């Protein structure tokens, strides 16, 4: 132990666990910001149902967690509140060697080349949805983003193609994934699902399971399994060093996990991007130009759209923290923390740091163009061995969907106040659903041709020099 280490927990508010739980549920990032202002970059909360939680906003301390021994820093244990939905073999809930081996087995569908093959289907899904948007009328775009991201998962991840089953999945999955606090209680305590008070939730899970097991059975029986590119097909084919493949239950758990981890999270990121762009006319104009360039095959267009996505996820993180439960005493941020404590890298606090991001409240995608991002200072997907498996997929999906929106419709800008982040389950959503207005449709063929003739992209003209952003 270092001679500068302190025994015990860092300081924190002395409020009761139930009061702190209410503050976290209702005020989330505002409460954490107030604690950081009073106690510094490391502080302790005692939240009912979670015990002691040590929050970290210093990148050096976060590096200790992300680079630490996975057998000491348990992320699966920290995610146990989702056990009733995800299942015991979910990648989010397992730890140690079991997690390492399962993640290795599941990685191929999320490699860059495999993800790139899904860009075309994602664009088609987005274009079909955009074609039905209302004109000259304000509407909440968040539900539209959820429709797009759900369809992307159903068709590219699950690989569903049967019209009847697809229709059933479109109906059942949103009902299952959009549960309230009462249902969340049963998901954290699976034994409650047998209680009649939660019978409706149990039936929703059973309906979803029946559809997913049917897809798994179809994939196993498909004579063209080897040629399929959907994620489920690749998971069915995957085998470990001993030739063992995943069981039906294991496959089911991973599909539900991918739905939970990749549906509302990406939809919310896209919603925030549109909420931010429509309040920044100059940036919106540059993004439209980048979308046209991207559609014409100009890599600079992709780069600027990626910068929009990265800056959105910085300034409006969808998830504002990630947790690890300590299995033994360990030194973090100058404190010798005991086993059982949850250490929590505070994504939202890091992303709002003026030391790391000058003028952090300014939405400025240019700061991300050509930037080298540190894994402990830009961390919307978590970090270390538990970094989101689908991070590359999510970034490609955000880029492609933004491109299709901006090249197909003209969005009105607004001077109304920005929407407030509101906690929905474990994600931060725009409190009014990210309301936008479509002024007109755009001639896709004309814009693509103009770009191909040399209109170019703002990123290609030096949106910013290559530099390190948020690095230590």
Curated annotation (Swiss-Prot):
Give the EC number(s) listed in the UniProt record: 1.14.-.-
Q: Which domain of life is it from?
A: Bacteria
Question: What Pfam family does this protein match (any one)?
Answer: p450
Asked whether the UniProt record includes Transcription among its keywords, one would answer: no
**What does the entry list under GO cellular component?**
cytosol
Q: Where along the chain is composition biased (Low complexity)?
A: 452-472
Region annotation (Disordered) maps to: 442-472
Broadest EC class assigned to this enzyme: oxidoreductase
Q: Which cofactor does it need?
A: heme
Q: What GO molecular function terms would the record report? A: heme binding; iron ion binding; monooxygenase activity; oxidoreductase activity; oxidoreductase activity, acting on paired donors, with incorporation or reduction of molecular oxygen
What SUPFAM superfamilies does the record point to?
Answer: Cytochrome P450 (SSF48264)
For the ligand (heme), the binding residues are 388
- Keywords in alphabetical order, please: Heme, Iron, Metal-binding, Monooxygenase, Oxidoreductase
Question: Which family does the similarity line name?
Answer: Belongs to the cytochrome P450 family.
PANTHER family in UniProt: CYTOCHROME P450, CYTOCHROME P450 12A4, MITOCHONDRIAL-RELATED
What name is this protein filed under?
Putative cytochrome P450 135B1
Organism listed in the record: Mycobacterium tuberculosis (strain ATCC 25618 / H37Rv)
